[in-house]
Amino acid sequence: MAGRLIYLIGPSGSGKDSLLDAARPRLAERGCRIVRRVITRSAEAVGEAAQGVSPEQFATMQAEGAFALSWQANGLSYGIPREIDDWLAAGDDVLVNGSRAHLAQTRERYPTLLVLLLTVDQAVLRQRLIARGREALADIEARLARNARFTADLIAGHGAGLFVLDNSGPLAHTVERLLCCLDHGHSACA
């Protein structure tokens, strides 16, 4: 029996890394693997526990077929190791921190994937992005405007194939909704 590919997407600052870290032990209890992405940024960079590689290393890995999925976003390259296909074939559920812009290509390769869109109230997201200190306020405002359009388009375009998790409140609540969705499906936890 094949496992499920669970594709977590959401804007920068929505709390994807925090959600994955908080849910990790309970996901492991369910036999769900969380994929460690390969990213062309320093392994010491703040954020997720990704494998940091140089752009040259990434290009070599990609040419050698090391990735099941790969994409570029925000000036970086992201890769999902090919081993996820072995895990899925063995019946394991696999959770990927994915890309909203790469969703169509991912759905093409994995038509039965479960898409989880992590959202957050715009005011909360603004505060999180400001607190990170990576961008100027004008860039943050532009990002927020793009995010609002992108989220609306995603929800309109994917409807029943997309489960929305609101991460504006306590993280523990979002973890419970995530687990409910994985255990019981979309409709049980809407």
From Swiss-Prot:
UniProt GO molecular function: ATP binding; ribose 1,5-bisphosphate phosphokinase activity
Name of encoding gene: phnN
Entry EC no(s): 2.7.4.23
Any one of the GO CC terms: cytosol
Transferase is among the record's keywords: yes
Stated role: Catalyzes the phosphorylation of ribose 1,5-bisphosphate to 5-phospho-D-ribosyl alpha-1-diphosphate (PRPP).
Enzyme class of the recorded protein, top EC level: transferase
Pathway linked to the protein: Metabolic intermediate biosynthesis; 5-phospho-alpha-D-ribose 1-diphosphate biosynthesis; 5-phospho-alpha-D-ribose 1-diphosphate from D-ribose 5-phosphate (route II): step 3/3
Catalytic activity: alpha-D-ribose 1,5-bisphosphate + ATP = 5-phospho-alpha-D-ribose 1-diphosphate + ADP
SMART domains per the UniProt record, alphabetical: GuKc (SM00072)
Gene Ontology biological-process annotations: 5-phosphoribose 1-diphosphate biosynthetic process; organic phosphonate metabolic process
Identification of the protein by name: Ribose 1,5-bisphosphate phosphokinase PhnN
Residues reported to bind ATP: 10-17
Protein keywords: ATP-binding, Nucleotide-binding, Transferase
Family in the record: Belongs to the ribose 1,5-bisphosphokinase family.
